[in-house]
Amino acid sequence: MDWCVLYGRSKKNNSLINIERATMQTQEKQIVKFMNHKVDPTYIWHTAKDAAVKAVDEYMKDKEEPMYCGFANVKIRPAKGKFVNFLKRQGIGDIAYKGGWRISYYDIMPKSHPWRMTQSMSIKEIGCDAFAEALESFGLDCISESRAD
C-alpha cells in the first residue's frame, strides 16, 4: 500500500512538518542560550555535577556494582564559550577526538564519592547522561559518549 494513502497525508507535507519542528527546536535553543548567557559558569558546573551525583546515587540504591566495564564522558561542541573557558581555566577536561571539549566521568564525580573510581560502564553512563542533560538545559550543545573496555 502507498504510504500517502495509508497515513492520509503526502510525504511533502510530512517533510514540511519536520522542517518546521526542527526550526522551532533551533529557535527554542537559541532563546535558552540567550537567557542563560549571563549565568555564572560555576553555577552551571555545580548544577550539572549535582545532577550527575544524584542520578548515580539513585541508580545504585540497594544494588551491587554492575560488572560491565567501560568508559563514559560528555563532549561539548563547539569547544568555545564562557563555560568551556571556565573548564579550561580550572583544568577540567581536555580536547575531544574529532573536536569539542571532553569531560570525563572522573572529572564529574567528587573525589569522595563512593562510585567515583568504579569500572562499571553502566554507572558512568548514568552519571554522564544526567550531566549532559543538565548542561543542555542551559543551552549547551553536548552529548554523552561511552565505550566498552
Language model: regions and residue ranges:
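Acidic, low-complexity, intrinsically disordered interaction modules
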Residues: 96-112
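N-terminal leader/targeting segments
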Residues: 23-93
